[in-house]
Amino acid sequence: MNVYVDQSVRALAAAGHRVDVFTADPGGLDGTGSGRVGGTAGTDAEAGMSAQLQITDAITLHHLPVGATTKDELADAIDELAELLNDRPDFRAADFIWAHYWISAEAALRAHEKASGSTGTTGAALGNELQVRAPIAVSMHTIGAVKNRDSDTSHERPQRLEAEARIAAEADLLVAATPAERRDLITELQAESDSVVVARPGVDHSLYTPDSQSAARERLGFADDEAIILYVGRMQFIKGTDVAVDALAELHERNPHLASRTRGILLGAASGVGVEAGGGAVRPSSTYLRELTTAIAGEPSVEVRPPVPSHLLVDYYRAADVLIVPSRSESFGLVAAEAAASGLPAIASAVGGLPEIVEHGHSGLLIADHNPHHWATAIETLLNDTDLRTELAGHAADRAERFDWGRTVAAVLDALPERSCASSRRSEALGAC
């Protein structure tokens, strides 16, 4: 999500808009002055406890100093976030608010309520106060009900499920990354169809480009004769990290000769919570990661590495032979799009937005289930067929050209007037017509 906010903010600024970014990322609350504020404004500057940081002439980062140190604690601080937003003149003066993730969206809606003295829906009888209020667009990024459905669990907290239903009813515009997410917003959250716009995320094509595999491998310390299988993302059940590990283990058993020159790189870290399938007990993601690493303890060819910044990540894409994206739920799959732009074909789950990026048999391979046997077969197929990999890589890079951040923000901005004017009293009160 940080990449999405970073790049969409830059695209808005490039289109001539002034952008104020508000973040309550706990990374800025370590009290040392060295914590990054989430990367949401796309800077490597250390913002620490600063209340405001000028990123460019057009982009300002505002830090909201709540006492939360985890995502769950942040969800319990939504009223505090709403108060802090209302205290910021730049928030009150905004012409348009684009909230990312359910916590931010709920905070923005509550900020409107608090400013107007309303305790119910923001859509009715709010008087003249809302005449100066900006319309709210929301990108969910993930939907709690969809995560429960796709992982066959009931893990997502009721607070989130209730908030997302309310957000779908009250936001002026819902931004879906793909037609599949649009369907989910309508079927799972009962959003009105005319309130949802599809705006496909983009890729930073100035960074993610095909380049020499050999040079990238030299920079990363990989040998030219190795077969590199890459996984990039959080180590979570929902992301299918266990499928990646089990598939690599099966490849080792099935084809020891091929496995002897294959290295699996898992690039990521534990985040949030991991869950068992079928409504099993919730386990901390750190525990899930330990179980994964224990499972591969005797496999020197499989290596877990911490996340890296984008300027290093592109070298991993260029150095690898295949990306695997075994997610159980995925609203889009930005990793697959970045890899494609870098000339790396993916083997991906046929879920969510991934089929928008990976065209089966043309720019990569799609797997309909999470059976490690099928994933190992797909990996083996691509590693044994250099010509096929090369063909898929070329098509993947071509297909990735459709993902452009300028088009992303244009789709959102173009949808605002039509939606706001169609939104009866609320949007009229907002002055959107």
Task: Name each region found by the language model.
Residues 307, 315-320:
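Short alpha-helical donor nucleotide-sugar binding micro-motif in glycosyltransferases
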Residues 328:
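Aromatic "clamp/platform" in nucleotide-sugar-dependent glycosyltransferases that forms part
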Residues 268, 277-308:
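Nucleotide-activated donor-binding/catalytic signature segment of Leloir-type glycosyltransferases, i.e.
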Residues 223-239, 245-249, 265:
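Conserved donor-binding/catalytic core segment of Leloir-type glycosyltransferases
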